[in-house]
């Protein structure tokens, strides 16, 4: 089953530990530091739109893009006034209606880019849609996080009407992290009214209640900081900064998530103000 298909139904419930407000305040501070106090922004890999809505609340006009239509459907459920434009797009095929002041991507969405060439492609796409001097702020999980924190662990998260088992496996040579999600979702809860494929779903009885079991496989890639810097250069962008998410200092061997700030740079043939 494709990543973020069934998981989209319970994503916000199980990701309630993500510090979106803290991240949002920090990103807003960066935007203002670079002179971006208003205007149109785009979030890549916006998921259910939590960060998109936060930035909209800070006075920015927002576009959210995501490869998962199921995640976007959830995002649209939260959107009551229709001010946010959500687009179902693979970030490697980013296509906007014009330029934006800045692009952001959080919650390790960029780790879903599985090859160096695709990383360069995404950066080129972003550069093409940034206004002159615009910035791209994104985070990435580190090699240390995948190899030493998650590694080959198994994690279980049990909630009132659903449970998830995360089975992790990190491939050292390729630096690819694979994880399989096994989800048990109560069928008598109207919040989880989803169609399912009989080949992907199994019924289970627990404490007299009927649960449906689903599986999804996800893969992410860990990059070195030097690889990202090189990709930024190869994409024709300008590298500005990288720092640890928690300390806001230069990353070290214990950093689990890092932020990158890169800036738009002129490309021959680029069409500004589309």
Regions inferred by a protein language model and the residue ranges of each:
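Conserved class I S-adenosyl-L-methionine
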Residues: 1-37
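C-terminal lobe and adjacent flexible extensions of AdoMet/dcAdoMet transferase-like proteins
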Residues: 219-274
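A short glycine-rich, Lys/Arg-flanked "PGG" loop and its adjoining helix->strand segment in the class I
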Residues: 120-132
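Class I SAM-dependent methyltransferase SAM/SAH-binding core
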Residues: 42, 49-93
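Residues lining the SAM
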Residues: 106-108
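A short acidic, Gly/Pro-enriched loop at the edge of an enzyme's catalytic core
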Residues: 95-102
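SAM-dependent methyltransferase
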Residues: 137-231
